Structure formats: structure tokens, C-alpha cells
Amino acid sequence: MALQVMFGLEFFLVLEALLFLFTCYQVVKAGRILDEIQDKLSEVKRGERVGTKRKYGTQNKYTGLSKGLEPEEKLRLGRNTWREIRRKRGKREKKKDQLAEVSRKRSLCSSLDGLGKPALSSSEAGEESSSEETDWEEEAAHYQPANWSRKKPKAAGEGQFADWPQGSRLQGPPYAESPPCVVRQQCAERCAERQCAERQCADSFIPREEQRKIQQAFPVFEGAEGGRVHAPVEYLQIKEIAESVRKYGTNANFTLVQLDRLAGMALTPADWQTVVKAALPSMGKYMEWRALWHEAAQAQARANAAALTPEQRDWTFDLLTGQGAYSADQTNYHWGAYAQISSTAIRPGRRSRAGETTGQLTKIIQGPQESFSDFVARMTEAAERIFGESEQAAPLIEQLIYEQATKECRAVHSPKKEQRLTRLAQGLSRAWGKPRLLKTDNGPAYTSQKFQQFCRQMDVTHLTGLPYNPQGQGIVERAHRTLKAYLIKQKRGTFEETVPRAPRVSVSLALFTLNFLNIDAHGHTAAERHVQSQIGPMRWLNGKMSLIINGMARILS
């Protein structure tokens, strides 16, 4: 068994050796055939192949010896020296740099206007000296056939159909080069203008339609000679407003400050509509702003109608909104009218947010994870939308903040509760005036020592109703109900909307209406019935004319 294994190994080794020898024989044979073919080739054809390889293939590094001619002739011409090699290499690099610069300028010009191929300037063309051209032609002559010559462009009438008679349909055109296409050149100019416009708008997030609207906004300025001129709104300012609206919302402080800055400029009603339409994210928001703007303009127009100056009486609703006769010319307004237009335009931005319950302050409660400062800011903002920026409502806001805060915040501020109640009472006194008399029920809130001390300090008489007698309290409640009803009626009128009044003035006007303008069936007002005595009919008593006054007879003399 061992002998068989050894015999098999020897057989495989001998077989591999034979295969190796056969492969070597084939390689040597192929090399001999290649040498024979190369020997048969002539020296001229070999030079042509080398020239073609150098012309169309990759250029190899120069070895220092020239092929095709004898070394003695090359040395005589000075083409094998290292100085000549470095000079030629520098020329090639310079030529490459020139071609790269020309191609770069050509691509730049074609991308901007596309009006044709640019021609090289005289300075660029002069860089090619006559000696360099001669060297290139001599170098190329070694690799080109003897019968080769440069083809010259044919002049007019020297084409392949030049021998045909004039008028023949095979006769060539009477010019050597094609004429320029005027239509194609005009199309290229329009394309170049469109590309420039697209490049100018490429770095903006605002669509092109909105940019056209922005370009129509022009505030009014007065020139040096007194004439009215328009100046465009800065693009960066409108862009900042649009970004602030998209990122933070229309009620953010940053957005409101930017609107206040824009309101300092004299913008026409059309300008405000254009700017707001470009800044708001949707047409629904714009329509909501436009409705609120018209509402504010109507209130301002009613206030202008009751103004003292005749100029302000002419500032109507159409003037403030740019409608009717003022739709065409909006640059010759009075400067005060532009201030009212700006104030009415930015007023809708300070209104309550959609879906937020700002009408009821009692529903604004501090959240469990909300900071106390954020809660105070929300309450203050909602109160300002209802009461305005008034110091009279500050005690009420403080009391609501204390009652609707979390337990932890109330525990911190609890020692100051008595001071807040005192400030609340003082605030009510400033708002409504110091009362002379207070009539309340017998509740513990009104019978406490703190309340009695407050009444003594304010010099107010405090009366309580009879215990277990709801009729006396009902009279007071009915009087309050009647007074409240008249206050609501006056608020619905036009005078209350246009001229905002203090609470004291509103109550005084309601009391004046109740006491002096309501007449009973006998033609007497409530004030007359209160101050006058009850006068009865006249009668004859003891032969004399007497008048019954308060149940007693008085003789008329």
C-alpha cells in the first residue's frame, strides 16, 4: 500500500514538470515571433506608431534621447540637452494653463448670457510667440507623413458644387460661415435674464408670488422740496417679520416689537395689506386680520367724527382703510392719519389667540409644572386685553393671582394677604371714588374687625340690614340690578365704543340717566320726586284757598 502511494506522488510530480516545460516553450516561441514581426516593420512605420501613441495616448516621461534621428544630428540641433528639455516642459505647462484659463472664461460667459463664443483678447493671443509656434511645428513634423499639409478653409464659391451653374439647387450658399441666428440670440438673452432672476431669489424662503407682493409695499416720505415720495420697505425687515410669525406666532413679543418698529413708518392702507399678506402663513389668517382691522378702523372713525379738530373729522372709515375715493391716491393723507392707520393695523396682533379663554380670568389657573412667573405673565396679558393698561385693575389681578396659584405659591405669599386686601380696597376706592355710606348684610366678612377698621380709616359709614329680613336686602339688590342694566345699555352704544371712559364716569352717566332722564306719568323725574314734597290738590278751608302739602293744609295768601 505504501509503495502505491509513493508511485502516485512521483507520477504527479513528473506530470507537473512536463506542463511547466511546455508552458515555457510556448512563451519563448511567442517572443521569437514578436521579434520577427518587429524586425520586418520599417523604421518609418515604427515612427508613425510612436507618433500616434504620443498624440492620442498618455505621454510618457521624456528619457533624454530622441527617436527617429541619429544622436549626432540631435546634439547638433540642441534637442538632447537638459536645458532644452526643461524649456519644452515649461512651455507645455504654460500652454496647459492658458487653455484652462480660456475654457474657464468660456464656460463662465456661456452660463451668464449664452450669446456666443468669446474671442481671445489681443494680450492673450500675443503670448504665443513665433518661436514657440515654430518649435511646435518642427516637433510635429517628425511624426507626420511627408505629403501631409494643413487644410485651409474654403472661400466662398470653392465648395464641391462650385462648378455647377448659378441657380442650381445643388449650388452651395454664397458664404463660407453660417450667419448668426437673431431669434436664437434673443431667446438666449431672455433665458439669461430668467437665470439671473432665479439666482437672486434662490437664497430666500419666500415664494416668488409673495416677493412680488413685498415689492409693492412703499412707505410714504416727504422730499426736500415738500413733495410726497415712496421708498420701499427693507427686505430684511419683512423677512424678519415673516420668520418671527412662522417660528414664534403673531402674539409673540418679538413679533409685536417688530410691528411697532414698522408702525413708526408712514405706510398706506394698501402697504399694510401687502406686508401682512406676505408675512402671515395662510390666507385664512389674513382674512381674520383684515376683519379685525376693519373693526378697529370703524371704531377709530367714530372717534374721529366726535373730534374737536375739523381735520380729524375728515378721517373716515374709507380713508383709514383705503377704499372708495381713497383707493387710488393714498400718499397725500395728513401725517396724523398715517399714525391712526398704523395703530389700527397692528391692533389685531394684540388680540386674544384663537381658542384661548381670555374672556374669563377665573379660568386661568397655574399648572402643576408651570413656573409662577409664566403664570403671572399669562394672567397679566389676559387682564390687559380686558381692562387695558390700567393701574386700577392691578389689585384685582393680584388677588386673582393669589387665589388661582398653586398651594406652594400661596403658602409663600400668604403673609402678605392682608396687605393685598387693603390695596384691593384702596384700588376700588380710586376706581369708583370713596363712598359715603356702605350698606351690607350681616355676613362675617362685613362684621370683622379688619373691615370695621378699614371703614373708620376711610371715613365711611357702614350700615347693616335687619337680620332675617331679606326684603331690605332685596331693595338694594334690585337697585344694583337696575344700575347694571343701564350700564350694559350704555356700553352697546356708539359713544362708549369710541370714547373709553373710567368706571366712575360710566356710573355717573348711568345715575344721571336714571335720576334726570326717566319721566313718570305725571311728568316728574326721580330727582324731582325725591327733593320735592308731595303736593296735593287745592281746597277751600274756612273760606280760604288752601293747599294740601304732606297731609297738612297751608293757606295761600
Swiss-Prot record:
GO molecular function: IgE binding; nucleic acid binding
Gene responsible for this protein: Iap
One Pfam family hit: rve
One GO process term, biological-process aspect: DNA integration
PANTHER family xrefs: ENDOGENOUS RETROVIRUS GROUP K MEMBER 24 GAG POLYPROTEIN-RELATED, IGE-BINDING PROTEIN
Segments of this protein annotated with the region Disordered: 113-172
Taxonomic source organism: Mus musculus (Mouse)
Note: This hybridoma was generated by fusion of rat lymphocytes with cells of the AKR mouse thyoma BW5147. This sequence binds only rat IgE.
Stored InterPro entries: Gag_p24_C, Integrase_cat-core, Primate_lentivir_Gag_pol-like, Retrov_capsid_N, RNaseH-like_sf, RNaseH_sf
Domain of life: Eukaryota
Gene3D superfamilies in alphabetical order: Human Immunodeficiency Virus Type 1 Capsid Protein, Ribonuclease H-like superfamily/Ribonuclease H
Name of the protein: IgE-binding protein
Keywords for the protein's UniProt record, in alphabetical order: Hybridoma, IgE-binding protein
Biased composition (Acidic residues): 125-138
Domain Integrase catalytic: 344-534
